[in-house]
Amino acid sequence: MIDPRLPLTDIHRHLDGNIRAQTILDLGRQFNLSLPADELEALRPHVQITKTEPDLVSFLQKLDWGVAVLGSLEACRRVAYENVEDAANAGLHYAELRFSPFYMAMKHQLPVAGVVEAVIDGIQSGCRDFDIDIRLIGILSRTFGEQACLQELDGLLAHRDAITALDLAGDELGFPGGLFRSHFNRARDAGWRITVHAGEAAGPESIWQAIRELGAERIGHGVKAVEDIKLMDYLAEHNIGIESCLTSNIQTSTVASLAAHPLATFLRHGVLASINTDDPAVQGIEIANEYHIAAPAAGLTPQEIRQAQENGLTMAFISEQEKQVLRDKIRN
């Protein structure tokens, strides 16, 4: 259960994986685009997971319709603003929204830096309107290769002060982290924090690579860490957080069942692990589902669920002073 005495966070939440089905329909009509259906309920199976996908790449294809309708920078601003509203409506006090500007720009050849600016504007407007603390994480979409990621990084760096951290996401097997060392060197030079999707499709070696070569302070998903006891010890000793996404890992066939999910193992090993959504609109879930249904099904005790909630704030890419402000806000 969610502890109302603690700030509720979601630190692994994709902005471009949380585009409302109604918004996809609206923007499709606005830009005269051909969609797989022209009514909301008929469209939903095309943009939302209705059954377990065979692998991560198949899961990611469900996200494509959301970005396919981003025909203007104003459309990008709209989905960013709606993401803040959705986070506030979910009861979150703090969220880190991550997005890939190249992925959002690609279909309609929008300027990457312009997409970043539009997203920032939408987020800032949403934070003013909905009284929630949101930070932005830029994603390099490894699936599109090193050169595309350079364009993406340049676009993000053009607005570096509004970006908190850099992430690497996409096809983990086809594009290992070592290809992006220079990208992450530049990110660290800019003062950004680092989180990396690793150990989701690939094994523990991908997590080691993210830590040693890219400077990862947190790992997205990281389910394969349980296969390497030395890695588990290292994560616990160095407070490298695991951003767990329970339902997502089932839907991508990364984990066979919630009962087999390693989150409880992480917590019992002393690893800093938290509960997050991933792509709420695509998954058809929200943060409450993860706490009330998924976490108990994954074998977490009420005390472990509370610990995971507390870990979310501990892992957040904000200062201790900012964390205390969030705690004080709950108490008041």
Swiss-Prot record:
SUPFAM superfamilies xref list: Metallo-dependent hydrolases (SSF51556)
Record GO terms (molecular function): 2'-deoxyadenosine deaminase activity; adenosine deaminase activity; zinc ion binding
GO annotation (BP), single: purine ribonucleoside monophosphate biosynthetic process
UniProt-listed Enzyme Commission number(s): 3.5.4.4
Positions of Zn(2+) binding: H12, H14, H197, D278
Active site residues per record: E200 (proton donor)
Entry cofactors: Zn(2+)
GO cellular component terms, semicolon-separated: cytosol
Name of the molecule in the record: Adenosine deaminase
Organism expressing this protein natively: Yersinia enterocolitica serotype O:8 / biotype 1B (strain NCTC 13174 / 8081)
Source lineage: Bacteria, Pseudomonadati, Pseudomonadota, Gammaproteobacteria, Enterobacterales
